[in-house]
Swiss-Prot record:
GO cellular component: plasma membrane
Location, primary (coarse class): membrane
Residues the record marks as site: Important for catalytic activity: 145
Catalytic reaction(s) noted: tritrans,heptacis-undecaprenyl diphosphooligosaccharide + [protein]-L-asparagine = tritrans,heptacis-undecaprenyl diphosphate + a glycoprotein with the oligosaccharide chain attached by N-beta-D-glycosyl linkage to protein L-asparagine
EC supergroup of this enzyme: transferase
Domain notes: Despite low primary sequence conservation between eukaryotic catalytic subunits and bacterial and archaeal single subunit OSTs (ssOST), structural comparison revealed several common motifs at spatially equivalent positions, like the DXD motif 1 on the external loop 1 and the DXD motif 2 on the external loop 2 involved in binding of the metal ion cofactor and the carboxamide group of the acceptor asparagine, the conserved Glu residue of the TIXE/SVSE motif on the external loop 5 involved in catalysis, as well as the WWDYG and the DK/MI motifs in the globular domain that define the binding pocket for the +2 Ser/Thr of the acceptor sequon.
Sequence motif DXD motif 1, residues: 52-54
Motif WWDYG motif per record, residues: 457-461
Entry coiled-coil feature ranges: none
Motif MI motif in this chain: 568-575
Gene3D superfamilies xrefs: 3.40.1380.40
Name of the protein this chain belongs to: Undecaprenyl-diphosphooligosaccharide--protein glycotransferase
């Protein structure tokens, strides 16, 4: 009897659904932990390492906050939202720092089930919310970016807008004071947590205002909600924002009858003026300027150098095909179609769900803007599927017993989640670095000072700074073409040029931090170098760096290290592209070849490689299509660490080299095909062959996973 009473209590049922959905989400995320724990190479400092490259930026910021300081201009994320939250968790919990950054996403991202279930409950459809929560919490896209070890702001980037959506819907349905104050609170938190959410917040507030003007134009509380929410967009300190919002909320709550529409109109106008004066609309004006005056911007760019566009090399901003798009959002194509149908049906039944459109549309931008955006559509589409299933149950109950209906719903839910479970099982993401790589960088921390620089590719910037506590030229947040040019040049040109550019780029980067805003150092460091060295032709200036008699006039202020990991061989052609581009035209008109491969098959005296090259079994030539190309030399690498290799000359007039790696730390790089230009690059000569000018460099860390060289000039 007591159990029946509990089951009749809607609040207990709602609470039970939230707990079950939350536990389900957390449990699914622990699968990766269980799997990764089998590999010692994924551990560092007695804990699994994280799988998010950008996560090391926030980890560095949190580490510096715990230490209480950081170096000037070190690009540390000191004081950022995720770093701050991590800092406080470290201070108030007994867990290690490594454990906190590993599991934060596991537990915080699973909170998405709460607003989903609460929102559905506002429509008196708890089943809709429960099913939607199960699906949304583990759908492919959301899982990929919030799984255990994915230490990034993504862990709350969907949770917070779903709470905003919930309070908007609740405000529409209940018109209560709690929603009135909670709405600006969560918008403010969202803007603090993820500043890039500004546009989405503007869209949500704008749509809420339009909805108000159409359906609730005579109800004052809705206009106050818009005003309070808009104040969070202002570019002033949070405590001033909070004070203004609380005062206006209190005035409305206590003097509601005296606040007529004229006063509300004045408040609204004052809010708009305040936003303009405080810089709250600057992001919108920037977007308008960028898109409306694009031709002017392009003209400005042509006055300087035209660098390689980094967006061409980032998978997250590549277009995604429609099948993959559907799978990432709903787990499978069929569930996506049902979800879309269900969402349209939900809109017809409950017009307030139109407030979800900005979130849904942002997710659909993935079709043009890249797969990273799909994460936004996940919870909204899941609500559509949950609604469809709840309607399906209502139909079943009319024809069959409650038990039969429940069994059908459970079965349908399991079928829906089956593709997601398969995805979770197969999605075995490796840690960003291996244990050996992390240990090497930790070793570098004991060699280098905090003011020293490590020159390496931007993919490794954040982890290098975290483990070695040094500075870098580039990282996951600073990697425009003009930034990437310098490490690309130092890695892909000859040693002399690499050494000179490493010194110049570091010293000029440091100088740029203290230069006036209109100084050329702020806009283009390469042009600043040329100006100081009285050079007007960029090609002649860059060529002069290869000459031994090139004299560096810039004073040496710190030590510089070159970090060359084995894993960079997989992307080295991309790395080199940034400095082989024609800076006057922006065209990659200096062709080069560097291609890693592994054997797929051996037949008829030929080795078929994964990069499409067919190599003769005597290694004397290779075929690309119908073209047979001679090989200059075969280089057999017996030991990268010891620098043991054997060069077998074949045709000294040929342009291509074949590297056969018998000692490779990268499983999918057994062969490397390269031309003479790449063969003479600093990366190939110094890392693979161990050839370096001892007047320019010292080898301070040596392993087959990575090598670190200290610049001597």
């Amino acid at each position: 009897m007591l159990k029946k009473e509990y089951l009749k209590n809607p609040y207990l049922v709602l609470f039970a659904m939230i707990v079950l959905a939350y536990v389900f989400s957390v449990f699914c995320r622990f699968y990766w932990v269980w799997w990764a724990s089998e590999f010692n190479e994924y551990f560092f400092n007695n804990q699994l390492m994280i799988i998010s490259n950008d996560g090391y930026a926030f980890a560095e910021g949190a580490r510096d906050m715990i230490a209480g300081f950081h170096q000037p201009n070190d690009l540390s994320y000191y004081g950022s939202s995720l770093s701050t939250l991590t800092y406080w968790l470290y201070k108030i919990t007994p867990f290690s720092f490594e454990s906190i950054i590993l599991y934060m996403s596991t537990f915080l991202s699973s909170l998405v089930v709460i607003p989903i279930i609460l929102l559905a409950n506002e429509y008196k459809r708890p089943l809709m919310g429960f099913v939607a929560a199960l699906l949304a919490s583990v759908a492919n896209s959301y899982y990929n970016r919030t799984m255990s070890g994915y230490y990034d702001t993504d862990m709350l980037v969907i949770v917070l807008p779903m709470f905003i959506l919930f309070f908007m819907v609740r405000m529409i349905l209940k018109k209560d004071f709690f929603s009135l104050i909670a709405l600006p609170l969560f918008i403010g938190i969202y803007l603090w947590w993820y500043p890039s959410s500004y546009t989405l917040n503007v869209a949500l507030i704008g749509l809420f205002l339009i909805y108000t003007l159409i359906f609730h134009r005579k109800e004052k509380i809705f206009y106050i909600a818009v005003i309070l929410s808009s104040l969070t967009l202002s570019n002033i300190a949070w405590f001033y924002q909070s004070a203004i919002i609380v005062i206006l909320f209190a005035l409305f709550a206590l003097e509601q009858k005296r606040l007529n529409f004229m006063i509300i109109g004045i408040l609204g106008s004052a809010t708009l003026i305040f936003l303009i004066l405080s810089g709250g609309v600057d992001p919108i004006l920037y977007q308008l300027k960028f898109y409306i005056f694009r031709s002017d911007e392009s003209a400005n760019l042509t006055q300087g150098f035209m660098y390689f566009n980094v967006n061409q090399t980032i998978q997250e901003v590549e277009n995604v095909d429609f099948s993959e798009f559907m799978r990432r959002i709903s787990g499978s194509e069929i569930v996506f179609l049902f979800s879309l149908f269900g969402f349209v049906w939900l809109l017809r039944k409950h017009k307030s769900m139109i407030m979800a459109l900005p979130i849904l549309v942002l997710g659909f931008l993935a079709l043009k803007g890249g797969l990273r955006f799909t994460i936004y559509s996940v919870p909204v589409m899941a609500l559509g599927f949950g609604f469809l299933l709840s309607e399906f149950k209502a139909i079943l109950v009319k024809k069959y017993s409650q038990l039969t209906s429940n069994v059908c719903i459970v079965f349908a839910t399991i079928l829906t989640l089956a593709p997601v479970f398969i995805h979770i099982y197969n999605y075995k993401a490796p840690t960003v670095f291996s244990q050996n790589e992390a240990s090497l960088l930790n070793q570098l921390k004991n060699i280098a000072n905090r003011e020293d620089y490590v020159v390496t590719w931007w993919d490794y910037g954040y982890p290098v700074r975290y483990y070695s506590d040094v500075k870098t030229l580039v990282d996951g947040g600073k990697h425009l073409g003009k930034d990437n040019f310098f490490p690309s040049f130092s890695l892909s040109k000859d040693e002399q040029a690499a050494a000179n550019m490493a010194r110049l780029s570091v010293e000029y980067t440091e100088k740029s931090f203290y230069a006036p805003q209109n100084d050329i150092l702020k806009s283009d460091i390469l042009q600043a170098m040329m100006k100081d060295y009285n050079q007007s032709n960029v090609d002649l200036f860059l060529a002069s760096l290869s000459k031994p008699d090139f004299k560096i006039d810039t004073p040496k202020t710190r030590d510089i290290y070159l970090y060359m990991p084995a894993r960079m061989s997989l992307i080295f052609s991309t790395v080199a592209s940034f400095s082989f581009i024609n800076l006057d035209t922006g065209v990659l008109d200096k062709p080069f070849t560097f291609s890693t491969a592994y054997p797929l098959d051996v037949k008829n005296g030929e080795i078929y490689l994964s990069n499409g090259v067919v190599l003769s079994d005597d290694f004397r030539s290779f075929k690309i299509g119908d073209n047979v190309v001679s090989v200059n030399s075969i280089v057999e690498i017996n030991s990268i660490k010891q620098g043991e290799y054997k060069i077998t000359p074949i045709d000294d007039k040929a342009q291509f080299y074949i590297f056969y790696l018998k000692d490779s730390a990268i499983p999918y790089a057994q062969f490397i095909l390269m031309d003479k230009t790449m063969f003479n690059s600093a990366y190939v000569q110094m890392f693979f062959l161990g050839n370096y000018d001892k007047n320019l460099f010292d080898l301070v860390i040596n392993s087959r996973d990575a090598k670190v060289f200290k610049l001597k000039i």
